[in-house]
Amino acid sequence: MGGDIFGRELRLISFGESHGPVVGAIVEGAPAGLPLSEEDVQRILDLRRPGQSELVSQRAERDRVEILSGVFNGFTTGAPISMIVRNEDIDSSYYEEISRFPRPGHADYVARLKYSGYNDFRGGGRFSGRLTVSMCMAGAVAMKILEKLGIEVMAYSLEIGGERAEGFTLDDARNYRYMNPVRAPNEESYLRMAAAIERARREGDSLGGIVEAIALNVPPGLGEPIFDTIEGDIAKAMFSIPAVKGVEFGSGFRAARMRGSEHNDPIRVIDGKIRYKKNDHGGAIGGITTGEPIILRVAFKPTPSIAKPQETVDLELLRNVEIKVKGRHDPCVVPRAVVVVESMLAFTIADHIMRSMRGAI
């Protein structure tokens, strides 16, 4: 099973399964001398941990990180940083019962085809949102690199179930997003989004939504044309997050309905520096960062595990059946995905910084 490594100079190796003993991350290429503790990583993990409100999964995981290597006396050594989180609240009996009935919207069927039935299917195995634990652990390391360079990465729930956040500032989002369980940028949108999630939960259904992410103070010149563009690598990082169905930068798909005279961002001298007057390009042109904020939006599908009856098949008897998915699932993955988006955005930018600086920061 491949596809477990992300990055070039800064590399994340993800391992583990949803119902296995651990979920882990190995980060290779991090420079020596970064201050890093288990508390630093734990702070990021706690932002995605389940069971923190009725609006998310009630799986009772502590998600306590253990750093096994690569850190000594509170600083990175330059060696690979290996980290694990132990899976504690596991009940696989239901997944044994339904192994012959692939769940609609999940990777059960395609995984069975690809790996001839040898894959660990419990809780979705390698395809579970549980694997975002490894992304958050790696993101904590990347954020230390960005912090040293004054780069800030933030994300928030822009839209859930058609309820879109409005009337907020960047400071509103920065200060409020982790003060509410929905990760909304202001109180008004939080109340609407929370009510929508609760309605779907009561009805045995689920919702999708959009996470907006911004990276500030990113230097110009990161990225390469054609196959190593900054947007391409960020998009790949986002699509590695389970449930992601779309990514757009700047004006995104709205650009298809604009004229060139509207979309082109004027270049001006502002306070003695060359800047763009607006940012429809979203922080990158030609695959290379411009120095303006990187702005992207990530679309998440509704959680496929729902309590309503769904049509599927019996793989052994080859007949059509109905299934009702049980378990402790998020009625909407968006709130817990916000910090995962931040983590993977931070990791991608840090990787490109390491490329441009040949590993020295």
From Swiss-Prot:
Pfam families: Chorismate_synt. Pathway: Metabolic intermediate biosynthesis; chorismate biosynthesis; chorismate from D-erythrose 4-phosphate and phosphoenolpyruvate: step 7/7. Its cofactor is FMNH2. NADP(+) binds at residue 48. FMN binds at residues 126-128, 286, 301-305, 328. One of its GO terms (biological process) is aromatic amino acid family biosynthetic process. Keywords: Amino-acid biosynthesis, Aromatic amino acid biosynthesis, FAD, Flavoprotein, FMN, Lyase, NADP. It is an enzyme of class 4 (lyase). CDD domains: Chorismate_synthase. InterPro entries: Chorismate_synth, Chorismate_synth_AroC_sf, Chorismate_synthase_CS. The keyword Amino-acid biosynthesis applies. Its EC number is 4.2.3.5. One of its GO terms (molecular function) is FMN binding. It comes from the Archaea. This reaction introduces a second double bond into the aromatic ring system. Belongs to the chorismate synthase family. This is Chorismate synthase. It comes from Korarchaeum cryptofilum (strain OPF8). The gene is aroC.
